[in-house]
Design a protein with these regions (language model features):
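Amphipathic alpha-helical scaffolding segments comprising HEAT/armadillo-like alpha-solenoid repeats
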Residues: 160-167, 177, 187-200, 219-228, ...
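Residue-level detector of conserved catalytic or cofactor/ligand-binding positions
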Residues: 295-303
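Helix-start/N-cap signature of alpha-helical segments
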Residues: 260-263, 271, 290-294
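Non-catalytic protein-protein interaction scaffold segments in large eukaryotic complex-forming proteins
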Residues: 1-153
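Residue-level detector of extended alpha-helical repeat arrays and alpha-solenoid scaffolds
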Residues: 206, 210, 234-238, 250, ...
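Long, low-complexity, highly charged intrinsically disordered regions
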Residues: 112, 116-200
Length: 304
């Protein structure tokens, strides 16, 4: 940085990790191959993500999977969760330490980490099972605030999200538990997680809100619609919902149509696109005695 040579401080790490970090530092200017131990590759990846202008992207994970295999890539992700990097800019010191302290904000997962999700989804069953077992076995050794990533990587096993939620919801407020909404399916756990919709709002995120909303619907279908209720007035989630031909999606949009002009416009477009779902939604609203919402939706349908 600023053409100055940084120094490293990893004295807070265990002896085993100190040896790993020292080996990684010796490889910074060398050839980085999957012949390196996976913990060393994890340190090198963490340094790239934290200390360079160009963040580690999906193609880096693609290369690791291609050269080292999916199990190796899984090991890299597991080890990556166990370390953290801080940069003391004033003294130009890069500090590597255990990742035990949770931030008080919702930390986004890197594109590098999330790319493993795609590779796992494309793997043959036997290989997927091996990688899934690695990830599940690693959970007790990963700091609590980073454990939701494991559930996120294994949407085929919502019970992992349920176990993490049941274990951590009553202990402390961890912003990262918001991520469990993407893969959890249990109604009671989802209801408990609702307290996390403010101020974190994973489905209202500027960068990925629409993507995660669409992902949940693709993986879980219309059964996932109720969890979007707190986010229906937001642009990113609602822009996805207006393309869903289902009465409950229309019900959600009609309920918030009076909030803003954009909310009303989305509801109007959805009613025009899916008139039968709109009529079913109006019938449901009338049955629940939601008079104001019914009047707004009815007026929109009559305009069409």
């Amino acid at each position: 940085r600023d053409n100055k040579t940084a120094t490293f401080d990893f004295s807070a790490c265990s002896l085993e990790w100190q040896n790993t970090v020292a080996q990684a530092i010796s490889q910074i200017d060398g050839l980085k191959t999957t012949q390196l131990p996976s913990p060393v590759m994890a340190v090198l990846t963490a340094l790239e993500m934290k200390c360079t202008r160009y963040k580690v992207r999906e193609d880096v994970m693609d290369q690791i999977v291609q050269e080292g295999g999916l199990e190796y890539a899984t090991d890299v992700i597991i080890h990556l969760q166990q370390i953290d990097i801080k940069w003391d800019y004033a003294n130009n010191v890069i500090i590597i330490l255990p990742s035990g302290i949770a931030p008080d904000y919702l930390e986004q997962y890197s594109r590098f980490e999330l790319r493993l999700r795609k590779h796992l989804s494309l793997a043959e069953e036997s290989l997927w099972q091996k990688c899934a077992q690695k990830l599940i076995a690693a959970i007790p050794h990963i700091p609590e605030w980073r454990q939701p990533l494991i559930a996120l990587l294994l949407p085929e096993k919502p019970e992992i999200a349920h176990e993490i939620a049941q274990r951590l919801l009553g202990q402390k407020k961890l912003p990262s538990l918001e991520w469990l909404k993407i893969v959890a399916t249990d109604e009671h756990i989802l209801a408990s997680l609702e307290k996390y919709h403010e101020p974190y709002a994973i489905f209202d995120d500027y960068y990925c809100g629409a993507i995660w909303s669409a992902t949940v619907l693709q993986e879980q279908g219309v059964a996932a619609l109720p969890r979007f209720a707190p986010y229906t007035a937001s642009d990113y989630c609602a822009d996805v919902l207006r393309h869903i031909n289902h009465p409950f999606a229309l019900t959600l949009l009609i309920r918030v149509a009076g909030h803003t002009k954009r909310c009303h416009d989305r509801m109007t477009k959805a009613c025009a696109a899916f008139p039968h779902a709109a009529m079913a939604a109006l019938t449901e609203l009338l049955g629940q005695k939601e008079e104001n919402s019914w009047q707004i939706g009815r007026a929109s349908c009559r305009e069409r």
